[in-house]
Amino acid sequence: MSWIVKLGKKGKKIVKKIITPAEKHYVGYTRRIERVKTGERICAMTFDDGPMGLPASPDRFEGKTLTDVLLDTLAQYGAKGSFDVIGDTSENYPDEAGKLGSAAWGGVKFDHYPDIHCDDKGGAVHNDRLIRRMLDEGHQITNHGYRHIIFGKKPFVYGAREYLPGFDAAVADLTRLDTQMRERYGYTLTLARPPHYVDKMAGGFTSYDVYERMGYQYMAASFDGAGWLPSTHEDPEAALQAEIDAMVEPMRKALEKDPDFFCGQIIFQKDGYNMAKRTPVAFALGKQLALLKEYGYRVVSVGELMEESPFTDVGRDDPLFEKLVALAKTRAIVFTDNKLRLDDKMTVGELAMLLAPRDEAISRRVAQLRKTGKAGPYDGAMSYCRENGLIDASTKAEDAVTRLPDAMFDKVTDFTRRNIYAAYKMEE
């Protein structure tokens, strides 16, 4: 039942608050993007787990595939989406269906999209027409994993699930879909979301390491569009209506309380069945888009949203904005929570991430993890900078910056991140 999933999520939050130390964010090449800073009424929508080549459920759209219904609805409102697609789950066997209404409804050991034993109706491999329609109509496609296998253990809800054995397997899985999109469609993927948001992996690696290797940003979300959890109503019509209401009413209340609530936010949706094999998104998406339109919002892809501002705490009104955008394209200057924290003092580890070439910083950290199973987020960059005399060999990553290489910076007396980035001499 859906209450198990809800209980698991609540339990995880409690454990995080009471037992687990607060997550430490660090400067890296990949950051988790949940929302961006903007005063404009612009937001993004993402659609996970498709494309789906089966009809909506219940089918009231003359047999159209669910993905076609979603694309029709987006077109009706002039909206664009980011479709977080999978490749193909037909390799995810042997397996069996779990209990309807549970997290394992579509498979005990693996996920199957759009449903178990219907894998040939789901994913990019089997839905060339839908992928081409997404691209032709200006939507974005992102990488949700070729086989949609979780990156590591997730005991609260998916304790029986198979997971990828480590870093290399995750890179290989993502590369299969990445290669297909490039070779078949000439399309370059730039964003990804890990299956079920599982980040920790075997060997001390995380999804951030994988995405850095792939050249991706981590596409998260700040608002749950809902619909994926089933209603407990026994009557199917009442259940569907409850699920539609669960998608629309929280959005309505948020807008009534604060018309600017969704500025810069990323809204999560599902391109597939919920746990009861219904698709309330087919019926609720239009209502959500109508609400957003009523309040003057433009609904865009995550990529377009990031063109407004790629950062959570710095917008276009900041005098350093353009330089920061340019720097972030080639250097690690943003924390993993997508914040710049410009007014804080910079540490030596953060300086090393600014100075070290991307490939050196990433490859050295990966090599250390392979060798020892442990590596700090700045160890690769620190190693390079020490070898090349860019930082003092005796300094530690957590030490405050007290001096800068003269050839690379204008004069700085107060070593905040803002001042250091402003003083950095950009490469011609």
Predicted regions: what they are:
Residues 75-79, 135-136, 175, 179-186, ...:
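Sec-exported extracytoplasmic/periplasmic mature domains
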Residues 309-428:
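N-terminal propeptides
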Residues 3, 8-159, 165-189, 194, ...:
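Active-site beta->alpha N-cap acidic-glycine motif
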Residues 90-91, 150-151, 198, 227-228, ...:
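Short secondary-structure capping/turn micro-motifs that flank functional sites
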Residues 67-71, 82-83, 127-131, 171-174, ...:
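Extracytoplasmic/secreted envelope proteins and their assembly/folding machinery
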Residues 59-67, 120-127, 163-174, 200-204, ...:
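Solvent-exposed, acidic/flexible segments
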Residues 119, 123-127, 133, 146-293, ...:
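Catalytic domains of cell-wall/extracellular-matrix polysaccharide-remodeling enzymes
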Residues 48-50, 86, 195-197, 270-274, ...:
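Short strand-loop junctions, especially beta-strand C-caps/beta-turns
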